[in-house]
């Protein structure tokens, strides 16, 4: 995000962004450009969910109204994305009943050896990129994918792991669920280890489990983002963090470590927390208002990810507050 005090815009790779809704040349995007990007994000999200088999053939597809509510997009944006999906034969509208998936992914992998891909959630901006990258690499090596989404529920993780083990998968790629907490599915992970099934965690890992992982350095990244804010004059810095995933805890660690190292006062009231279970409530307009009332004196905020940042920026805009003129935001992912 563009900084409020200096007006600078910095982008740190490793999926971290300091961002001011700017175009390629640093100019603010027109509303039509923003709507076009939103339509493409929604289309990519839906296309990946359908072709990966997360939403299966003949399953009911979310309605226009539910998609508007989920993403905060206009009806026209949602309709444009759905129209393209329908034109490609991925969904079918049934008058008086709703919209249904009309794509069968069951025969795509054929007899190829399978890799189980277990993700904790699917979001509009990140899930398609993660899935597409993994699929491309595995397909090149002759593997198919069995994908499942736990919605960050440990019970669902157990069900899917049991199913994948019964299916004799050749390997596992796992994004941990509620990874900040002790995991109750130790028995299943011990069985994975006993069978010597190659297993790799992405984005996070579980404590005391002997598996390799590929992760962003969340703590270090948060430290660097906080340092940038401090070096540009901010002394009243708040944050919105997620407490049930390791990424949120690590980002909080980096944040408070940087404040301490630079002698900037930490204020409990300026830190707001949420989890998967209460995310909808905390990121509703009422929930964001409660957060804002506790943090309104902050000149800068660190936000858990760009999904939350979008909600918060929209809330601020509705109150006549603008990024970067009135407040600076730093965030992760995108």
Model-derived regions: residue spans:
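Short, flexible, glycine-rich and Lys/Arg-enriched loop motifs at helix boundaries
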Residues: 105-112, 175-188, 277-280
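Amphipathic helical "hinge" segments at domain boundaries
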Residues: 106-171, 256, 261
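Bacterial carbohydrate/catabolite-sensing allosteric modules
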Residues: 1-7, 13, 17-28, 41, ...
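Structural motif
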Residues: 118, 173-175, 300-302
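N-terminal helix-turn-helix DNA-binding module of bacterial transcription factors
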Residues: 4-109
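The beta1-alpha1 cofactor-binding region of Rossmann-like NAD(H)/NADP(H)-dependent oxidoreductases
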Residues: 64-65, 154, 219
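Short amphipathic alpha-helical segment that frequently serves as the phosphate-/nucleotide-binding helix
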Residues: 64, 131-132, 252-253
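Short histidine/acidic/glycine/proline-rich micro-motifs that form metal-
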Residues: 121-124, 151, 177-181, 242-246, ...
